[in-house]
Amino acid sequence: MPPVPRLPGRDAVPRVVVIGAGFGGLAVAQGLANSGTIITIVDRQNHHVFQPLLYQVATAGLSPADIAAPIRSIVKRQKETRVLLAEVTGVNTSQRHVLLSDGNTLEYDALVIATGARHSYFGRDEWAEHAPGIKTIDDATKVRRNILLAMERAETIRQESLPDRDEYLTFVVVGGGPTGVELAGAIAELTRHATDMDFRFITRRCLRIILVEAGERLLPTFPAKLGDAARKALEGLGVLIRLNGRVTDIGDYGVRIGDERIATTTVIWAAGVQASDAAKWLDADADRSGRVKVEPDLSVPGHPEIFVIGDTASLVDASGRPVPGVAPAAKQEGMHVARSLLARFTGRRAPLPFRYRNWGNLATIGRKRAVAEIGTLRISGLPAWLLWSTAHIYFLVGFRNRIAVGANWLWNYLTFETPR
């Protein structure tokens, strides 16, 4: 692979701009540490968020600080790395400039776009106001506030027959993938525990937690046996499962599934994602979800100096399988890009085309309940939950966060007290 050519007048020291400080972006920056490369990380937030656990912030299982870490603290030992709090509005590929919302630009010799994805409402963006998703700390705290306020308001209505009370105590999660399953289970445990311990005029039989999935089963990317195990675990928590349920409208009143109108004040969206605007910035080919179609080395066709990774990229890897938009894949892609850039800048042989190593699929359904697929191994129940917990603590960024989350989970497991 030839080295990346530099434009005339540029410094001899390579400049790498990384847009996005998620799993993939940080893996690139850390992989280039102490390489003599000037690295600039650009992000709209000054902290990295462990997104797989955002749902636990939304359901009062963890505090926001437990799953967030300042980006500058993560790379503080990398003297050649700087962090820029800014919003990217475009890329000038001919001049190799990243365009920022404040009018400034950043020069690059190599660019890595790891901007992730946002929620997709399948052309009904007006639903977002009534059915927020959970992609950021702000999203999670908003959902948590909505859930807890709904229960507080229901507590003030003493007569169980009043319709307003039912609306406050009905919680609808749209989407039966891992996020939706984990969220529905966590809401069920939170609300059941709260009614037992904290409230005086709400009982478990007043609650309705509804999980809506458009397909024929939950967890469609998992083996059918594990999807069935997840369904049974959720039903054991009192969650109502609506399979083959097509959401036709969401508004102030609640949600409509087919012809059925469900009155609720809390609808949470976990049904689909759309890639960031990277394809528009680059004028690149994209798939139906807006993800940039990349080469086997994760570079953009026609632009060997630009890489796209994580949820923003669409790739069928060397094994012939599509790379999923999950945290382990983004991290592996980031490490691969870092190795590729080091090879290019030093004139060494490039690594082989990217190949995703799938370490398995995990999803939890409350305390002591989870499903796991690790190679040919398929397990559920407590062993899967312990595996899920260990894996998530391992991938957390920062020793403090690992200790805090582990301690919180142990305390919650023993006492079920939640840091609200």
Language-model region placement:
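Short, well-ordered coil/turn residues at beta-beta hairpins
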Residues: 101, 114-115, 245, 270-271, ...
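Short glycine-rich anion-binding loops that position phosphate/pyrophosphate groups of nucleotides
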Residues: 24, 116-119, 184, 273-275
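FAD-site-proximal beta/loop scaffold in flavoenzymes
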Residues: 129-161, 253-256, 260-332, 339
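A Rossmann-like FAD-binding core segment of flavoenzymes
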Residues: 79-91, 188-296, 300-302, 349
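C-terminal, flexible cofactor-proximal segment of oxidoreductases
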Residues: 2-4, 13, 333-420
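Rossmann-like dinucleotide-binding core of oxidoreductases
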Residues: 164-222, 229, 240-242, 324-343, ...
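Beta1-alpha1 glycine-rich phosphate/pyrophosphate-binding loop at the start
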Residues: 2-85, 89, 171, 178-222, ...
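FAD-binding core/adjacent interface of flavoenzyme oxidoreductases
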Residues: 1-17, 81-172, 257, 268
